[in-house]
Design a protein with these regions (language model features):
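Acidic-basic catalytic patches of nuclease active cores, encompassing PD-(D/E)XK
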Residues: 1-25
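Conserved catalytic cores of phosphodiester-cleaving nucleases, focusing on short active-site segments
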Residues: 15, 34-55, 59-60, 64, ...
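Hydrophobic "anchor" residues on beta-strands that sit immediately upstream
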Residues: 21, 44, 88
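Short acidic/glycine-enriched loop/turn segments that link adjacent beta-strands
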Residues: 30-32, 100
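Gly/Pro/Ser/Thr-rich low-complexity, intrinsically disordered segments predominantly at protein N-termini
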Residues: 61, 81-82
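Aromatic- and charge-enriched substrate-recognition/interaction segments
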Residues: 67
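Domain-level recognition of nuclease-like catalytic cores that cleave nucleotide substrates
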Residues: 82-113
Length: 113
């Protein structure tokens, strides 16, 4: 398992332990991708997982660029169109500095995505 897949698996376990239900992993469409899609009660949650081993090129949060946010929004719209309805939604980010649960930061309702 590569580091990205390991980070996504760790994030999924972390969110599930906090009551979210993982609906889908690695949702892809032309031009977009979402790492995790989950349910938090009635809210559909689109989750971006970011792993940074060091901060030489910025933090995990800083690595969510404008282009990445556009791809997330595109994939979310595609997913909702396939779903055929639009439940309440939000975008979250799970940030990891290492592949350990003690180094996880969960940002709910990230603005700008």
């Amino acid at each position: 398992m590569n580091r990205g897949a390991a980070a996504e698996a760790l994030a999924a376990s972390y969110l599930a332990a906090r009551g979210l239900t993982i609906v889908q992993r690695n949702y892809r469409c032309r031009g977009g991708e979402i790492d995790l899609i989950a349910r938090d009660r009635e809210v559909l949650v689109f989750v971006e997982v970011r792993l940074r081993r060091n901060r030489e090129f910025g933090t995990a949060a800083e690595s969510i660029t404008a282009a990445k946010r556009r791809r997330l929004r595109l994939a979310a719209r595609h997913y909702l169109a396939r779903l055929g309805r639009e439940p309440p939604c939000r975008f979250d980010a799970v940030l990891l500095d290492a592949l350990e649960t003690k180094n996880i930061e969960w940002l709910r309702g990230v603005e700008g995505i």
